[in-house]
Amino acid sequence: MESWRREKLSRLIAHFRRGAGERGIELLASSTPIQPIMIGASRLAQATSQALEARGFFVPAIRPPTVPHGKARLRVALSARHEESEVEQLLDALASALAAARVTEH
């Protein structure tokens, strides 16, 4: 990979992680382009994934048996082709979808 792509991807990862923290989105430790978002309940992960897909974002839910019960998560895959504005749109959509899914969960 060309150095400018690596540098851009590193900036996008840092931007995503910082923005997620600012929005209260719980991330698992990862310095790679794969950013796991801890959700917990499988239904909540699936509902959030579907809400994001309806908004044009492909963020798959990773559920048992791939991960232990109660440890469902979302899988964000960043690439150097993404722009910061797209990462911001994703973060806003994530925060909104998570809030909506949590409301319907109760």
Tell me what each language-model feature is.
Residues 54-58, 65-106:
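PLP-dependent enzyme catalytic core of the Aspartate aminotransferase-like
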